[in-house]
From Swiss-Prot:
Pathway(s) this gene product operates in, as recorded in its UniProt entry: Hormone biosynthesis; thyroid hormone biosynthesis
Protein known as: Dual oxidase 1
UniProtKB keywords: Calcium, Cell membrane, FAD, Flavoprotein, Glycoprotein, Hydrogen peroxide, Membrane, Metal-binding, NADP, Oxidoreductase, Peroxidase, Repeat, Signal, Thyroid hormones biosynthesis, Transmembrane, Transmembrane helix
E.C. numbers: 1.11.1.-, 1.6.3.1
Species name: Homo sapiens
Bilayer topology term: Multi-pass membrane protein
């Protein structure tokens, strides 16, 4: 077995042996890290191995929690009690200072437990209030930092496996303090030349500490100096702690090189490796011999047993008890100063750093000293060694000099600490047993009384024992090992310490396979062993220093009387420099201002981006105005002179808007930046105009109060500008003959006195409510009351008068329309240019309650322009033209003349040129019933009983009689409708169908008894309760957006789960990392948001996969996922992500601050790949974290990119500079690159971004490749047409293989405007057409420039038009309509879009005699207000003109009724019915499509379809719009499908 192990070891260490024919290394070279010393237990004594325990660990929880207060005394109190005493007492054994520091050197070779552990755990030492050293101000909150040491990670998990500390050096006496504890460390010390250790400029000194050699570089507590400069490279990490330890390191450094030189002379053919290894083994052997056989007996006054050979089963591991025993006993002998002398026994003065001279080197001011002025040369070091050899150490007792007790080097935070208190904490950290347990375990006699600890001390100074006993509450069993062992020491270490140390060295010697006396390891011959045994430290000093041996005593560890060079006197603190006081440092000192500036700069990123965006928007707007100027000839041609720039104040909660004020004869005109007229103020006598001028804040405000209108408040830049306008106004008003009154108010009072537009609107709303309450007998509570304590402005509601502009606005018409002029002139009886309450009421009573004769007479008077009692044919044409103006000039003059001639001819007035009122009334004879029963259907208003009676009477009319208007039936109760709605009832003619006379005029044949559709709108009672409206609004919101809510809930649940998972991990499960102990809130916030941000910024890419979304919309997934809301979801994700990004940044700001004030020992645990704890303590500054780390720098750049992208992507700037948005949004590529780099540095955790990013990135990349494969084909524009209202019609080639469906959209880029800027537009062409067409409205710079570019070119039109890039189609079509013989298309709001192409397609196919299965289409559009479908008028008109076979029937439902007393809707309702009867066209659109007011009655409508199309067994119903509407359609289809008749197949899409 032994042979096999030896063979394996030989193979293992073969790499250490140089190759060659002649190999002078004939032995097994010892490893530097201590491994494989014992061939059975390879790890014994290796670097990083656990310490051995002689006694079981003593922890509070039995595992790792140390004991402490209140069970044990305060360490500082205990230190002051035990170790305080006088200095200058000589060693009773005459031990020298050299022996003391040689003991420290031996300890550094054997053990190191000072290195802080990870995660960082602190056992800070609380300082008692009023401590003269550390708390002289009696603050009571002072603590000395103490960090627990490293432990074996395999321990500390259970009471059976308590925490064991780890030794950071080898546990062998193998010269690791000289050569290092690893091969790499040794290589860093070597010169690789002639076997020597590397030296600096002076061959007597090693080179300075530098990377990769990582020496402990603690700051100098006396001067604060730090850094590696002045620290030498030794094998011991802390070899530079004191000049005295440093001198011993230099001694062995020089001794090795001395031996290497000697061997090189003896063996000139040896290589560097042979020389180094021979010198190394000789130096180690000498070191072992001196430590064990010379120093240890002088230290213990005991000798080790005779060496009997290597004992492989003996564990040589260092014990925790040995660490405390050896170091603490040595600390009692450290003097306050150290002498220096030369070989001739001259004790020289020491030059201090302040240039003063003292008799000795003060210990407390020498810790971690760099480049001390008295230690600049090898001779200085020699003098220090000689001085330590002649100086008697302090007495071996329990007293520590103040240099050790109060001025021991601490961390940079506290430059000083208490050595004994720190050792006590270290013992508790190591789990050392109590004093009594240790004695019992080591076989020593038990101690039962405090006096028995040290009888000599009890006799000489019993107060120390008594005070110590008091601290432990007289309980000897709680006395700790360290103070107990210290108290029992007298002359020599006490029995406990002596036993521990002796036992440890026996195990070290006998268990070391490489011990120099082991003749079986092949290291030395017996002769060489004898030479080594005869070598003493005196021999080493003589050889290195090159002095006469008589200058030193034979045993340099003890000085006896008669030895050479006695010390002048025993040193005490007297006559020595005072110790530098403790300094408390703030790591963040001097960084506050810069840190604040940095954070402020980061916060300014959005502001800088806003400024940039504003500049770009201004430049783009300037170009936009220049382009628009060419299309404003009608406005520019007006002579607007005297214009002045100002800001119009619109109200307290409204933003100010820039305006231009122009003074013209008889009026003041206010326009905006685009020269669009915002307001015209008429100046007519005898008006009285009031000026109110501000008297403070720069006197820049002007209030112009105009009677019967809202006020105009203008803000100017300078008082001079305001004054100039006032002067011009005075002149203009005097010329107009108007009186002026001026006064001044403070600006705040002026704005409170102003009547704003919003206040005027509320005033008019009350006006209209009470107006209709008078006409329709509406409940006063519904109309709105006027309390007595209401403001003056509200009480004036009934006395206010409407201007012409307000009257026109209330009708939704233009002030210059002829209809408005006619009605206003008729109503304005006093001719003052305003309508009073009474004037409006008089004309409204006629419209709402008058007889047919009164209503026709009113219309007659309106259009009797010359007032001669006759309406000429021209006036009749003007009357119709007034309606045509309202309907956007939908009929030409020829068509209008034809209609008038036809109406005159049918009434028998073809020979008349003028009509009397009787003739005019005769022409309207067919509408008597409609005029009679014209009532205003107001939600919440009961229908008059007379109407109900008429309904009841109408139900008994036979089939061959004409029943009243179904509008009357619509007002009956639901039960009445259900009982009276019979097939016979459905045969009554409807007011929604043109009257028989009108149909005959246009050649339409009417069958008296054919089934008709029930299309009258269903109206509901309007609930005015705010609670009811809120509940209904919430219910509609949930109903309309249930898919959106579901998807958003799932998405945010995932994001929230990711946040909570990371937050929980770092709050509760990451204690082993230690980062939460440093920055809990910051790390939880930053890591939680980072997880959510990674998820959001990854999956936001899917919302831009247009091709994928287009495909998925046509699958069943569209019923669950609102793919149409992808862009809105994109914005929502982006908004949430930027909020989380800000929170993420805030979290890291907190982290950076805390990292900037955390010592290096903590940071090295948190970031082991970034920091190494070298004792320097000083953390990196804040700017290092921000700008010199990959995550920090990329994070700052990411914030800048996000600021730019988000600002330019805002709705405001996107409208003003789409190109800016387009270009900045392409920064997303750089954004994702930086995100990957940002997270891949693994500063805190392993990269996780790729987990979220990979799948969306692949999908997005594939989607982009699909787009790139087609959008780079140049498309020629066939036709470009400039239409009114800034609309550009483009018709261009259809690419080969381009298939699309109705309602889909494309993205185009104009090559003349840039090949990378794409804009989305809906296709307005039908799928059957050979070309594609778009209708583009000039609403921004790009579309305006597009309109300019496609203006009429010269030469060949097709060749001259700039070409396009095309990408698409996107979206989903609605194409199953052709599978049904009868189809019903129901569009709600914008949901009508997909049906426009369907209508065109159907009409086209029917017009070319194409075989089409679908024979009839009913198109129903439900919209809130008539203004929402003005853009569709041209398409529907085209359908009507081409629909020669009457395939399409269009019905439009306006859901906004007069329940809100909206005059516009009410009057247009009346005018619509009148216009429909007269001209068979809608007043709003000029179409033959029927316009209804209310909601469509789907169930009666579908029932009537079964009567109209009895032969059709299956009808397709297609609905697009809000979910509430499609749900009602679905419900109606389900109810009808319960009958065994026609089946209604419903297909719906929600918008």
């Amino acid at each position: 077995m032994g042979f096999c192990l030896a063979l394996a070891w030989t193979l293992l260490v073969g790499a250490w042996t140089p190759l060659g024919a002649q190999n002078p290394i004939s032995w097994e070279v010892q490893r530097f890290d201590g491994w494989y010393n014992n061939l059975m237990e390879h790890r014994w004594g290796s670097k990083g191995s656990r310490l051995q325990r002689l006694v079981p660990a003593s922890y509070a929880d039995g595992v790792y929690q140390p004991l402490g207060e209140p069970h044990l005394p305060n360490p500082r109190d205990l230190s002051n009690t035990i170790s305080r005493g006088p200095a200058g007492l000589a060693s009773l054994r005459n031990r020298t200072v050299l022996g003391v520091f040689f003991g420290y050197h031996v300890l550094s070779d054997l053990v190191s437990v000072e290195t802080p552990g990870c995660p960082a755990e602190f056992l800070n030492i609380r300082i008692p209030p009023g401590d003269p050293m550390f708390d002289p101000d009696q603050r009571g909150d002072v603590v000395l930092p103490f960090q627990r040491s490293r432990w074996d990670p395999e321990t500390g998990r259970s009471p059976s496996n308590p925490r064991d500390p780890a030794n950071q050096v080898t546990g062998w006496l193998d010269g690791s303090a000289i050569y290092g504890s690893s091969h790499s460390w040794s290589d860093a010390l070597r010169s690789f030349s002639r076997g020597q250790l590397a030296s600096g400029p002076d061959p007597a000194f090693p080179r300075d500490s530098q990377n990769p050699l990582l020496m402990w570089a603690a700051p100098d507590p006396a001067t604060g100096q730090n850094g590696p400069r002045g620290l030498y490279a030794f094998g011991a990490e802390r070899g530079n702690r004191e000049p005295f330890l440093q001198a011993l390191g230099l001694l062995w450094f020089r001794y090795h090189n001395l031996w290497a030189q000697r061997l090189a002379r003896q063996h000139p053919d040896w290589e560097d490796e042979e020389l180094f290894q021979h010198a190394r083994k000789r130096v180690i052997a000498t070191y072992q011999n001196i430590a064990v056989y010379e120093w240890l007996p002088s230290f213990l006054q005991k000798t080790l047993p005779e060496y009997t050979g290597y004992r492989p089963f003996l564990d040589p591991s260092i014990s925790s008890e040995f660490v405390a025993a050896s170091e603490q006993f040595l600390s009692t002998m450290v003097p306050p100063g150290v002498y220096m002398r030369n070989a001739s026994c001259h004790f020289q003065g020491v030059i201090n750093r302040n240039s003063s001279v003292s008799r000795a080197l003060r210990v407390c001011n020498s810790y971690w000293s760099r480049e001390h002025p008295s230690l600049q040369s090898a001779e200085d070091v020699d003098a220090l060694l000689l001085g330590m050899a002649s100086q008697i150490a302090e007495r071996e007792d329990h007293v520590l000099v103040e240099d050790v007790r109060d001025f021991w080097p601490g961390p940079l935070k506290f430059s000083r600490t208490d050595h004994l208190a720190s050792c006590l904490q270290r013992g508790r950290d190591l789990g050392l047993p109590s004093y009594t347990k240790a004695r019992a375990a080591l076989g020593l006699s038990p101690i039962t009384r405090w006096q028995d600890i040290n009888p000599a001390l009890s006799r000489s100074n019993d107060t120390v024992l008594e005070a110590t006993a008091a601290l432990y509450n007289q309980d000897l069993s709680w006395l700790e090992l360290l103070p107990g062992g210290l108290l029992e020491s007298h002359r020599d270490p006490g029995p406990l310490f002596s036993t521990i140390v002796l036992e440890q060295f026996v195990r070290l010697r006998d268990g070391d396979r490489y011990w120099f006396e082991n003749t079986r390891n092949g290291l030395f011959s017996k002769k060489e062993i004898e030479e080594i045994r005869n070598t003493t430290l005196q021999d080493v000093l003589v050889a290195v220093i090159n002095i006469d041996p008589s200058a030193l005593q034979p045993n340099v560890f003890v000085w006896h009387k008669g030895d050479p060079c006695p010390q002048p006197r025993q040193l005490s603190t007297e006559g020595l420099p005072a110790c530098a006081p403790s300094v408390v440092r703030d790591y963040f000192e001097g960084s506050g201002f810069g840190f604040g500036v940095t954070i402020g700069t980061l916060c300014c990123f959005p502001l800088v981006s806003l400024l940039s965006a504003w500049i770009v928007a201004r430049l783009r707007m300037r170009n936009f105005k220049r382009l628009q100027g060419q299309d404003r000839q009608s406005i520019v041609s007006e002579k607007l002179v005297g214009g002045m720039e100002a800001l119009e104040w619109q109200g307290h909660k409204e933003p100010c808007r820039p305006v231009l004020v122009y003074l013209q004869p008889g009026q003041i005109r206010v326009v905006d930046g685009r020269l669009t007229v915002l307001r015209t103020i008429q100046l007519q006598p005898p008006q009285k105009v009031n000026f109110v001028l501000s008297s403070n804040r720069g006197r820049r405000t002007l209030l112009l109060k105009i009677p019967k209108e809202y006020d105009l408040v203008l803000l100017f830049n300078l008082e001079e500008e305001r004054q100039a306008l006032v002067e011009n106004l005075r002149g203009a008003l005097k010329e107009s003959g108007l009186s002026i009154q001026e006064w001044e108010l403070r600006e705040q009072e002026l704005m409170r006195a102003a009547v704003t537009r919003e206040q005027r609107r509320h005033l008019l709303e009350t006006f209209f409510r009470h107006l209709f309450s008078q006409v329709l007998d509406i409940n006063q509570a519904d109309a709105g009351t006027l309390p007595l304590d209401s403001s003056q402005k509200v009480r004036e509601a009934l006395t206010c008068e409407l201007s012409r502009a307000e009257f026109a606005e209330s009708l939704g018409l233009k002030p210059q329309d002829m209809f408005v002029e006619s009605m206003f002139s008729l109503a304005d009886k006093d001719g003052n240019g305003y309508l009073s309450f009474r004037e409006f009421l008089d004309i409204l009573v006629v419209f709402m309650k008058g007889s047919p004769e009164e209503k026709s007479r009113l219309m007659f008077r309106m259009y009797d322009f010359d007032g001669n009692g006759l309406i000429s044919k021209d006036e009749f044409i003007r009357m119709l033209r007034s309606f045509i103006e309202i309907s956007n000039n939908c009929l030409s003059k020829a068509q209008l003349a034809e209609v008038v001639e036809s109406m005159f001819r049918e009434s028998g007035f073809q020979d008349k040129e003028e009509l009397t009122w009787e003739d005019f009334h005769f022409m309207l004879r067919d509408h008597n019933s409609e005029l009679r029963f014209t009532q205003l259907c107001v939600k919440g208003v009961e229908v008059p009983e007379v109407i109900k009676d008429l309904c009841r009477r109408a139900s008994y009319i036979s089939q061959d009689m004409i029943c009243p208007s179904p509008r009357v039936s619509a007002r009956c109760s639901r039960s009445d409708i259900e009982t009276e709605l019979t097939p016979q009832r459905l045969q009554c003619p409807m007011d929604t169908d043109p009257p028989q006379e009108i149909r005959r005029r246009f050649g339409k044949k009417v069958t008296s008894f054919q089934p008709l559709l029930f299309t009258e709108a269903h109206r509901e009672k309007f609930q005015r309760s705010c609670l009811h409206q809120t509940v209904q609004q919430f219910k509609r919101f949930i109903e309309n957006y249930r898919r959106h809510i579901g998807c958003v809930a799932v998405f945010y649940a995932i994001a929230g789960g990711l946040f909570l998972e990371r937050a929980y991990y770092y709050a509760f499960a990451a204690h082993h990392t230690g980062i939460t102990d440093t920055t809990r809130v910051g790390i939880i916030l930053s890591r939680g948001t980072a997880a959510s941000i990674s998820f959001m910024f990854s999956y936001i890419l899917l919302t831009m996969c247009r091709n994928l979304i287009t495909f998925l919309r046509e699958t069943f997934l569209n019923r669950y996922v609102p793919f149409d809301a992808a862009v809105d979801f994109h914005r929502l994700i982006a908004s949430t992500a930027i909020v989380l990004t800000v929170l993420h940044s805030v979290g890291h700001v907190v982290n950076v601050y805390l990292f900037s004030i955390s010592p290096l020992s903590v940071l090295s645990c948190l970031f082991p790949g970034l920091f190494h704890d070298d004792g320097s303590e000083l953390p990196q500054k804040y700017y290092w974290w921000f700008f010199q780390t990959v995550p920090g720098l990329t994070g700052v750049v990411l914030l800048l990119i996000l600021a730019i992208m988000y600002v330019f992507a805002s709705h405001h700037f996107r409208r003003r500079s789409f190109r800016g948005f387009w270009l900045t949004h392409h920064l997303y590529i750089l954004l994702y690159v930086l995100l990957i780099i940002h997270g891949s540095f693994a500063l805190i955790q392993l990269p996780r971004f790729h987990i979220f990013f990979l799948v969306p990135a692949i999908i997005y990349g594939g989607d982009k490749l699909v787009s790139l494969s087609r959008k780079k084909v140049e498309i020629s524009v066939v036709k470009a047409e400039l239409l009114p209202s800034g609309v550009t019609h483009l018709r261009f080639q259809r690419p080969q293989g381009f298939e699309y469906k109705s309602g889909q959209w494309v993205r185009i880029a104009c090559l003349a405007l840039g090949t990378t800027e794409y804009h989305p537009f809906t296709l307005t062409s039908a799928p059957h057409e050979d070309t594609l067409s778009l209708h583009i409205r000039a609403a921004g710079p790009w579309t305006t420039r597009l309109r300019e570019i496609y203006s009429a070119p010269t030469g060949d039109r097709c060749a001259r038009y700039p070409k396009l890039y095309l990408d698409g189609p996107f979206g989903e079509g609605h194409q199953e309509w052709h599978k049904f013989e009868v189809s019903v298309l129901v569009g709600g709001g914008i949901g009508v879009t997909p049906f426009a192409s369907i209508l065109k397609d159907l009409v086209f196919k029917s017009s070319v005699s194409c075989q089409v299965f679908c024979k009839k289409i009913y198109f129903i559009w439900v919209t809130r207000t008539q203004r929402q479908f003005e853009w569709l008028a041209d398409i529907i008109r085209e359908v009507e003109e081409n629909d020669h076979q009457d395939l399409v029937s269009v019905h439009i439902y306006i859901t906004q009724l007069a329940e809100k007393f909206d005059l516009r809707t009410t009057m247009l309702y009346i005018c619509e019915r009148h216009f429909q009867k007269v001209l068979n066209r809608s007043l709003f659109t000029g179409l033959r499509s029927i316009t209804h007011f209310g909601r469509p009655p789907f169930e009666p409508f579908f029932n009537s379809l079964q009567e109209v199309h009895p032969q059709v067994r299956k009808i397709g119903v297609f609905s697009c719009g809000p979910p509430g509407m499609t749900k009602n359609v679905e419900k109606a289809c389900q109810l009808i499908n319960r009958q065994d008749r026609t089946h209604f197949s419903h297909h719906y899409e929600n918008f």
